[in-house]
Regions:
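Short, Lys/Arg-enriched N-terminal segments with co-localized hydrophobic residues
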Residues: 42-71
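Bacterial signal peptide processing site
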Residues: 98-100
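Bacterial Sec-dependent N-terminal signal peptides
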Residues: 71-84
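Extended amphipathic ligand-handling, pore-lining, and cofactor/metal-binding catalytic surfaces
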Residues: 123-125, 173-415, 420-482
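Beta-rich interaction/scaffold domains
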Residues: 121-183
Length: 482
């Protein structure tokens, strides 16, 4: 039926109240249809977000996401069905023109009820959109004077939503998982942002993660090991990803210093000797940017030293390996073998099982570190260990290339595990997620393997890795003593 005024049936004499004209009915139908119309929303970029000038190289999404497109499709279906119902009710009113007044009154009542439901649905959308806007406002890579208040406002607005309204939260970067996804107990973590530092500070600088359990076991695990090893130094924390700092603060009320805040705190507390221990994997872009920020504060301390990242010096090409990379290769392989139930990597190989360790990847010249890790694995005799990266840089570490390499080697079982300090978003989503582009899904879709299992564990929880950071810190402290 075409909803145009000229196509509506004539109003029967005395059958409807005089105000129920063809134009009135048409306007009501359009109003109901408009209330249910789904406004176009720009689809957010799946893996990237905008960041400030402070850390321009940080390009990956950090926040947990899962099944968002399916949720939007379901909402579209519900709204389409509701709109069709509303229009059908209006059609019922129209076809009743000229009939009994009681029948018309019932139709008008039904239309009014539907309009009321539409208004309620519209109110839900507005409430959800308000929260989405508040989340988008703090989903940034820089801190402002308004950040604390914005974090509180976003959480308060989220808490005020009903469960149904929470499912409707969609913004440029916002989704229900921002506040709604359970990533563990934040109280197990320690922000390490207290004053009364003393003269000696050991500042542990990490990218960060919004996954509470991983933050406590991986990052805090390293910090605790360093504090135990060096009781005369006060261990403090700094994250370089403001997007994560804001997320944790808004959702859990935990305030973590960014690099600038941590250095300002050190200066205000009269710190004289500063050791900076990055938990970064390599001498990459984040390591460089950390040093650029530190350079602005070096003259405010009597002595400053920066410890090596986990993998140590980069080296000239893929054939150059060092003791740090060898130690990491042994530690992560041993942990993976133990968790999988094998006695050794060789025993796993005999059972046609391959281990795939997924790193982040980078366009920085330090990307050769991943190739060096593959060389290290081969040198150690771990022929069933393969190194890959989310970003696919270096090229041979891209998922499709790793799949082909594992297939060509004849392995029929695969165990995926992150080659990352923290088992956060990348491990849970990019590696083990249910989306088609996750590594688990891609390995499964290849049809080449009998089984694919995932181990969600960061390097930071491995004791031998913690000890390697302790050794790097010792070298930095020794450098201050000449």
């Amino acid at each position: 039926m075409s909803f145009q005024p000229g196509n509506l049936p004539a109003v029967g004499t005395g059958a409807l109240p005089p105000q129920i004209t063809r134009n009135w009915l048409y306007q009501k139908a359009c109003k109901i249809r408009g209330l249910f119309a789904l406004p176009f929303r720009k689809q957010k970029t799946p893996f990237f977000c905008r960041f400030s000038f402070l850390y321009p190289s940080v390009q990956r999404r950090i926040l947990p996401t899962s099944g968002k497109e399916n949720k939007m499709k379901k909402r579209n279906i519900r709204k389409t069905a509701a709109a069709l119902t509303a229009l059908a009710l209006c059609a019922g009113v129209l076809t009743g023109c000229g009939g009994a007044a009681s029948s018309t009154a019932s139709s008008v009542a039904a239309s009014s009820a539907t309009s009321s439901e539409a208004s309620s649905a519209d109110a839900d959308e507005l409430a959800a959109q308000n929260v989405a806007d508040l989340i988008d406002a703090i989903y940034v890579q820089q801190r402002t004077d308004d950040t604390d208040a914005q974090c509180e406002a976003a959480k308060a607005a989220w808490d005020a939503l009903t469960d149904a309204q929470k499912e409707l939260v969609e913004g440029e970067n916002a989704d229900p998982d921002y506040f709604g996804r359970d990533t563990g107990d934040a109280s197990k973590d320690d922000a390490r942002n207290a004053d009364e530092i003393g003269e000696n500070e050991l500042l542990v600088v990490s990218f960060g993660t919004s996954f509470n359990d991983s933050r406590a076991t991986d990052i805090k695990g390293i910090e605790d090991a360093l504090q135990a090893a060096y009781p005369d130094w006060s261990v403090r924390r700094a994250f370089t990803a403001q997007i994560i700092i804001n997320h944790v603060q808004a959702r859990d009320g935990e305030k973590i210093d960014n690099m600038q805040q941590a250095l300002d705190r050190a200066v205000a507390n009269g710190v004289k000797n500063l050791i900076v221990q990055p938990t970064h994997l390599m001498h990459g872009a984040e390591y460089d940017e950390m040093n650029e920020m530190l350079d602005q504060y070096r003259d405010k301390f009597e002595s400053v030293a920066v410890a090596e990242p986990l993998l140590g010096e980069v080296g000239a090409d893929a054939t150059v390996i060092n003791a740090d990379k060898e130690a990491v290769a042994k530690a992560v392989t041993a942990a993976a073998v133990k968790e999988s139930g094998y006695e050794s990597a060789a025993a796993a190989a005999a059972d046609k099982t391959a281990f795939v360790f997924m790193g982040h990847g980078t366009s920085h010249t330090a990307k050769v570190s991943y190739s060096q890790m593959q060389t290290t694995m081969q040198t150690l005799g771990y022929d069933n260990v393969f190194i890959g990266t989310v970003e696919g840089e270096p090229e041979e570490t891209a998922c499709e290339n790793v799949i082909e390499a594992v297939k060509a080697a004849g392995y029929t079982k695969v165990i995926l595990r992150p080659l990352m300090v923290v088992a956060g978003d990348h491990a849970n989503n990019d590696m083990a997620g249910s989306d088609d582009d996750s590594w688990l899904s891609q390995f499964t879709a290849s049809g080449a393997f009998d089984s694919i299992d995932c181990q969600i564990a960061g390097l930071g929880e491995i004791e031998d890795i913690q000890n390697l950071y302790v050794a790097h810190t010792k070298a930095a402290i020794d450098s201050l003593n000449g």
